[in-house]
Amino acid sequence: MMVEKKKTTTKKTETKKQDTKKEAPVKQEVKKQAPAPAAKAVAAPGTTTKQEARIGVFICHCGTNIAGSMDIPAVQEYAKTLPNVAYVDNYKYMCSMPGQAVISKAVKDNHLTGVVVSACSPRLHEPTFRTATKEAGINPFRFEMANIREQNSWVHMHDREGSTEKAKDAIRIAVAKAALLQDLFPKTVPVEKAAMVVGAGVAGMQAALDLAAAGIKTYLVESDTSIGGRMSQLDKTFPTLDCSQCILTPKMVDVGRATMIDLMTYTEVDAVEGYIGNFDVTVRKKARGVLTPAEAEARGIVGGGCNGCGDCEAVCPVIKPNEFEVGMKPRKAIYINHPQVVPLLYTIDFNTCIKCGLCVTACGPEKKAIDLESKDEFVKVKVGTVILATGYDIFPIENKQEWGYKRYDNVITSLEFERLICASGPTGGHLVRPSDGETPMRVAFVLCAGSRDNTGIGKPYCSRFCCMYSLKHAHQITEKIPGCIPYIFYMDIRSFGKAYEEFYYRIQDEGAKFIRGRVANILEDPKTKNLHVYADDTLLDRPVDMEVDLVVLAAAIQPKVDTNRTRKLFGVSCSQDGWLLEAHPKLNPCGTTTAGVFLAGVCQGPKDIPDTVAQAEGAASAASIPIHKGEVELEPYFATCIEEKCAGCGMCVNLCPYSALSLVEKDGRQVMQVTEAKCKGCGTCGGFCPGGAIWMNHFATPQIVAQIDAFLLGGEQ
């Protein structure tokens, strides 16, 4: 019935396709002649001998995902008419074991030289079908995939006839390329038996410990003066209310003691070269001004170096806000973040140090730990794999001016609340109003402060853990301040984790008041410094004007300020919001599109501590596989230079984003040479080459031209 409908159509495009089908035998004859020069050109850069193409086409139903939107039998009959097609079949689930068996049997029985599978996205199942092709006895790179699901049936599910015709086009294009595909062979490169973890928060520490436990030398690079990250600033963790430092400090100590971990604090990645298995990373160890015992010993100072006694800090006359305490407590120009730092090593802030020399005198002639003339040091390390665990920053909530942060003293962020309520914080764990030091008895928590914000000022995404830590804060004030009432202004309470919903019920039972509605404005009473919170209660459908003593903003989180620079160094993509982009959100959440580079923690997107640690362990496991194997295979999608055409202009060398190209002297002239292990097959060089001297393996110019012809000319030459 589908064929009859097509015969009666009056559309020009439909008539064109029908005419193409009628002339199939003629096309077959022309096609046999046409590939001769193309095959010769493709084979020029070291591929296999030309042979007559015998292509097998396999059409997947994908249940009803594909078959429900198009006429599979009509598509199958059309595929039989295409030049070079020797076999056509269809199956309900081609990716299943029986489906792959269909491919294998057909290849062997019909002596096929290439395979085209018409199914879903190659991003999902290309490796599956490539393996099936290889097991059937064909070079796996003689496989081509036609996407007739994501790019067809799913978007044309209500246009059965149009979807059917589009599937025919997709298969015709894929067959045209498959007829010209050549044997390609992966390259094997050795892997350096070391790894690097960038960022030493809880994710980076866990990843480094797992790698070290697997016997892998690990360089742990942290830009701050000590390890621990954001978790070291927290008082308690939800929903178990464990002391954050109590569960984090042992892990920090383990990192400091691990012989297989080279801990590099106050250090940043400066440059990256190389590829999976052979990354050459240059790190910049910032001038610290204080010697470690090992550094002192290397200078001949026996028994010297910093021991964390604090004598230097006591005499330092320079005072500035302490970043670890979110500016609510002072620190000196020579300082440590907190008493439990790892490594226990003071740091001089040379931006504020006046070099008075008092710290040198206080340190004494025995330790000689102070070096006021120290300079930045650049160190090169070679590693096989890399894990990025760079963490996050707090969204500058002062940008949302309606909430009065940094205008009103008694409007604070959740991180400031954490330090105020923490026993090691600036107030010794006593929650007080910044304006007058009084204990607040009515506290408003504003959730989604900057999150789920489509105004263009805040962030459109959910920061995931704000709801839960605000519930934790509500518990802490009811526990520490009898009679204090927490008011929680929320949009939705997202208690998604294990025991989170139960924790939510517990906070309700403890007396917290919940008002569903976004806070529109906060104003201060200039006399009392109390705050009026204005919102709409969407459950009771009435406006709210609530006077409170303190407002806590659950500020959104965002990628760290240097995330963009770091990701570019390692060739990692990012999302629209700046979070590092995983290779696949479901199937490869720890990997990236750059082989050998993995992600862990919040740098990939907002997540709580359990999810962060779990991803860190997954990233460590993935990063250890190439190292333990000792070598890796690189897919042969490399640029290839046709030296007879190369003019040695060097344009491609300057354009290559991966530094994979160079000019070399050959037969008295310069020609382009590819470092195949660095090449990602992006095609930039080939697109810009003025002489057409660069082709991409598996995407050679004749193959692309054949696809274009198949689409525009219906396969006619």
Regions found by a protein language model. Give the residues of each.
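Residues forming the flavin
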Residues: 1-8, 12-717
